[in-house]
Amino acid sequence: MQKLRNIAIIAHVDHGKTTLVDKMIMQSHVLRDNAKNSGELILDNNDLERERGITILSKNVSVIYKDCKINIIDTPGHADFGGEVERVRNMCDGVLLLVDAFEGTMPQTRFVLQKALSLGKKPIVVINKVDKPNCRPEVVNEQVFDLMFSLGATEEQLDYKTIYGSAKQGWMSHVWNQPTDSISPLLDTILDEIPEPAVVEGTPQMLIPSLEYSSYIGRIAVGKVTRGELKTGQNVTLAKRDGVTMQKSRIKELMVFEGLGKKKVDAVPCGEICALIGIDGFEIGDTICDYENPEPLPPIAIDEPTMSMLFTINNSPFFGKDGKYVTSRHIKERLDRELEKNLALRVEPGANADSFIVFGRGVLHLSVLIETMRREGYELQVGQPKVIVKEIDGKKCEPIEEMTVDCPQEYSGTVIELATKRKGTLTNMETNGDRTRLEFSIPSRGIIGLRSNMLTATAGEASMTHRLKGFEPWTGEIEMRVNGSSISGETGTAYAYSIDKLQDRGRFFISPMEQVYEGQVIGEHTRQNDITVNVTKAKQLTNMRASGSDEKTSIAPPKVFSLEEALEYIKEDEYVEVTPHAMRLRKILLNETDRKRASK
C-alpha cells in the first residue's frame, strides 16, 4: 500500500499559501513543463480569485514525492471564509503554518492556528518571503512560538520544526540565509514530521466536511475515510447531522485526488481523501457509514454568521436591460444552490415574496456571492448590511471583532481617532521601525465602511485585518456616514452642462452622457441633508454669443465604487442595484413626494 500524508496549509491572507502549493506541484512534475511559466497561480482558478489575488474556496491537490503521496489542502486566509477553513481541518493529519518573514503573525494566523491546535494537529512552521528586504525571520519565529504558547499548545506541538525560504523563488532551507535550489527540505520535513493517517480496521466511516459541485454529476462528497475502506458499488448508510435520520444509499463511483485532477478507483483505503459520487441528499457534516449497523461521527460545529443583508429583485426603471435572470424565482434558485456548498451562509424569506434575507460572515463574504451572481447574469438589489444582534442573559449583545491596523507611525493618531469614533478601544500598540501596529476591540458595525476612510486618512498606507472575537453587550449608537446624497429628480441622460453647474454641491458618482433615473443616487451632497437635482438639462443653443462665455467646462472625475465600498456606503433608505454591466446606488422610494411622506 502506498505511503500517505495529509496536510493543510494555513496562513494569513497574502502570506503565500497558494504560491507554495504551486511550487510543490511543479517540483513533483504534475504539469507539463510549458505550463509552468504562465505566471498565474494554478490553484486560484476562479476569475474572482485571480482578480482579487485571494483564495476563496478550499482546494485539494496531491503530489508524489519519494514514493509517498502527499494530499495538500489549500485553505482561504480571510476570516470571512472561516467556514471554508474550519471544515477542512478534519481531513488533515498535520498543518503547515505559513508566516510572512516581514509581517509576522497576524490576527487571521491566530484564528486558523487556534482551530488546528485545538484538534491536536502538530504544525510545521514555514517562514516565507525571506527574500524581502528588511525581513526578520528569527524574530518572527519567536513570535510564532509565543503565539502557540499563548494559545495553550502542548509540549509536543511546541517542539515544531521551522523551515525558511521563498515560495516565489522556489527554495526552502533549514537556515534562512543559506538558500538551496529547491523546496525538497520542506517536502522531506513533511515526510519526517507529519504522522501517517491512522489505519483503523472495522466498518467504514467517513465524515463529509467538504463538497464539490459539477454541472454534469451534481454534488460530490469529499472527505477522509476515518475507518475501514470504501468500495465502488458498496451499499452504505448516510447518517444525517442530527444523528437520528438514516438514509440507505449506494456508492456509484469513487475518486481520489491525483495532481490537479481526480482519478477513478475501485476502493479507497483508510486515511485517504476521496470524492464520492452517487450519494443523494447529503449535507456537510453528515457521515457515510456501514449499511447494517451505522455509527455516525460527531458533526462539525461551524461559526455563526454575524451579518445580514436584504436581497431583492431589481425594480428600477432600468430593470431587465442587462441581466438574463431577473425574477425572484431565479434569485431563490441561485441562493438555494449556493447554500449547498457555502457553509457559513443562511437564507430566510423576507417581508414579501420578492425579498430574501441573507446571513453571512462579513461584507467580503456576501460581496463575493453578489459579484459571482452578477457575472452569471443576475440582476438584483441589495440593502445595507446589518449586524446580527443577540440577547444573552437578558442583555442586548452584538458581535465584537479584534482589529489590527498596520500603518506608518505619523498616521497612528488619525487611525486611533477613526477607530474610537466607532466605539473601538485600543488594546495594544507596538512600534517597529517607522511602522506601528495598533490592535483594537471594535463592534462589527463600526468596521462597515471603515476601510475606505482608513485608506483615505493614511494615504493608502494602512493595512487592516479583523476577526470575530465574540458577542459582547451593545456599545451604543455609532455615527456612520455624515453627508447626504444628491438624488436625480428626472429620468434621462446626464449632461456635462448640468453637472458642471452643480459641482459645488458635492462629488458626483456619474459621468456625462450616462443614463440616470428618478430617485438614483448620483453623488454625495456637501451637507448632511439629501438634495434632489436635475442633471438632464442640456445647454440651450441660441444664436447669441458673448465673447468668452463659452469656456470649456472642466468636470472632476466621478467617484467609482467597488462592490464592497458601495455596500458600506449606502444608508438605510438606499439600495445598491447590481446588474451584469452596471452598479448603481438608489433610494428605496424613487419618488421625492413618497420619500417626504415616509420621513414624516
Where are these regions (language model features)?
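Residue-level signature of catalytic and energy-coupling elements of molecular machines
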Residues: 14, 20, 53, 72-74, ...
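Interdomain boundary/hinge elements
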Residues: 37-40, 125, 151-163, 197-207, ...
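P-loop NTPase switch module centered on the Walker A-proximal segment
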Residues: 1-99, 103, 143, 211-214
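Alpha-helical scaffold elements adjacent to nucleotide-binding pockets in ATP/GTP-utilizing enzyme cores
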Residues: 23-24, 62, 84-87, 91, ...
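A short, contiguous, amphipathic alpha-helix enriched in charged residues
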Residues: 316-339, 556
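Conserved structured catalytic cores and adjacent interaction surfaces
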Residues: 2-19, 92, 102-114, 120-122, ...
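Conserved nucleotide-binding/hydrolysis modules and their immediate coupling elements
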Residues: 205-309, 319-321, 483, 492-542, ...
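Canonical P-loop GTPase G-domain recognition
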Residues: 122, 132-192
